[in-house]
Amino acid sequence: RDLDTRWPPPRRYHADVIRNLKNAGATLIVYDVLFSGPTTPEDDIALDKALKEAVNVVLTSRIDRNFTQLSKSLEEPHYDDELGIDFLAAARVGFAEVPTDADQIVRRFVPTMKFRDEWIPSLASAAFLAFTGKEETDIQVERDHIVVGGQTIPRTGPTVIDLVDKAPVPSAYMDFPAGNGTFPMTSFGQVALDEFSKVQFN
């Protein structure tokens, strides 16, 4: 049985997913969905409440580039002071930007990018920092490696230059020989409806 709705589903379903994963024993919930901007007050309040109750969620942001004005902006999870909504009040955040090669295959990742002269974490780095109890600012970029929360990542991938602010974008190749089906999968609808095996989440 699945949800009778199209993607993106109303945010109340995301609230159910977060709450059910938390109740199932998930140590960390990494949510690769950008919750920017408002939807309905009821749905936004429901998601805000679930995030604040869970306190173990990492959300997604996006770096937007204006190539005409040569400026960057950070599209972050939603907040509304009048309604008391702040999705980041009890959650972490990391940018979702995954480089692909010419054949559209993902072989490397970007652990961090520079935004307004500060190194900010990718979604994967933010998840690692949250899991290990480190601060989001615990990132150092050196000539041949990156240190994220005390973990050294060799800069084995190419370093490209951001066309907007000319900042270096370091990358590292991933050692992941496995394919689809390596990890067990559960549908969004099953988790939202609380019809899933809890064993794989604790």
PLM-predicted stretches and their roles:
Residues 1-157, 198-202:
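Non-transmembrane functional regions of envelope-associated proteins
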Residues 104, 156-160, 164-170, 176-202:
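Extracytoplasmic
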